Amino acid sequence: MNLLKSLAAVSSMTMFSRVLGFARDAIVARIFGAGMATDAFFVAFKLPNLLRRIFAEGAFSQAFVPILAEYKSKQGEDATRVFVSYVSGLLTLALAVVTVAGMLAAPWVIMVTAPGFADTADKFALTSQLLKITFPYILLISLASLVGAILNTWNRFSIPAFAPTLLNISMIGFALFAAPYFNPPVLALAWAVTVGGVLQLVYQLPHLKKIGMLVLPRINFHDAGAMRVVKQMGPAILGVSVSQISLIINTIFASFLASGSVSWMYYADRLMEFPSGVLGVALGTILLPSLSKSFASGNHDEYNRLMDWGLRLCFLLALPSAVALGILSGPLTVSLFQYGKFTAFDALMTQRALIAYSVGLIGLIVVKVLAPGFYSRQDIKTPVKIAIVTLILTQLMNLAFIGPLKHAGLSLSIGLAACLNASLLYWQLRKQKIFTPQPGWMAFLLRLVVAVLVMSGVLLGMLHIMPEWSLGTMPWRLLRLMAVVLAGIAAYFAALAVLGFKVKEFARRTV
């Protein structure tokens, strides 16, 4: 398997999903603006997403994929099918309980996670109503993530990567065509989330059948393999919960700020997630099963080469992305969101949060490579300890930054914390002699810095000659933005080529 081809496939699917996600956000911003209704929806949508990351894509994948890779490599197909059946049964049971409890306790959940909303009765009631509708998404998307983890282990990377597109399609359809039939209209977005969860699960099931892993969930509290996953999930849930608790605390802080703050941070986060998702999530998706297979087979040299390949690719693409995100923060927010009820002030506030987020983009992406280095070895405790340290320092930074920088201070805390997290993970990988960098890193980084400086000059020059970004229709703004972005990309890779960099070197990494 050529890792670069697999990464390109996953990244292209992820990019398509993110572009569609931007279209979704632009439509939502245009129809609903940034105010009480959108703040209520984003909180109601964020909470199921946080739990989904804890139970499904986060803790569950970290515990499940390395053991699944071991079963696939050593136990045979029949034993693997039984293992999948028992694990899916336990996951379904646990999440069904969480879903029902969350729906019943929605008002109390809001009191804890967004206490500032309690000061406005209408806002609090609307958020509770929306949360009851979106909570089943946890169960649906977690089962979809289980199916995706199995498909990834069988190297069917593009299928799970495409699935999130269906959520965006659902939300766009409901926003455009169903919202007028709901009272209030924002209820349409909540129902779109649940329908999107159903679509993502159903879409992947035929592909699971093709690889012979479509089995009925069964409950067995005594199966050795399933209990290993449960045992690993304990520290994994703690580790992932720490990072999600940090986001919840940020929401609590933001709920006390000016109306619209939650929405401004959400839109900035969506823009920041484009490069982190296209590269970071795609790399993590490919590296976890690949590293797990290398570890299970005892091939430490291949394991080390995979880590080095992933890190170099991170810096190759994340460094220019972070700089470009900061330089283009204004044109991005205006071109994508400043329409209808989304005002110039909303765009400016979103831009400030985006600049703050861009500081930590490299850290956010590098973590996606470094963390699987531990998870693939079934070592979850080390990242957990680092996550706890990061959480404490994040909240200290929140207290320091929220006064002078408001919502942008919360975004800056997340970015700086991501860089700290990545630094500590790297330090532990070196300290435990798990990873040794390959030769040539200094020359590699020097070329990147020079190329980024060239790219920055081109971007600033292009912005100088462009007319005001708020002028013209959305297609015209996006065409101008695309021209600037393409000029920056061309300048960056042209500079690398002049400096003797060969992209072909990355295509040689296979597993």
Swiss-Prot record:
It comes from the Bacteria. Residues 33-40, 110-123, 179-185, 254-263, 338-346, 403-409, 464-477 are periplasmic. Pathway: Cell wall biogenesis; peptidoglycan biosynthesis. CDD domains: MATE_MurJ_like (cd13123). Residues 1-5, 70-82, 155-156, 208-223, 293-302, 375-379, 430-443, 500-511 are cytoplasmic. FtsW (AC P0ABG4) is also proposed to act as a lipid II flippase. The identity of the lipid II flippase is controversial with conflicting in vivo and in vitro results. Belongs to the MurJ/MviN family. This is Lipid II flippase MurJ.
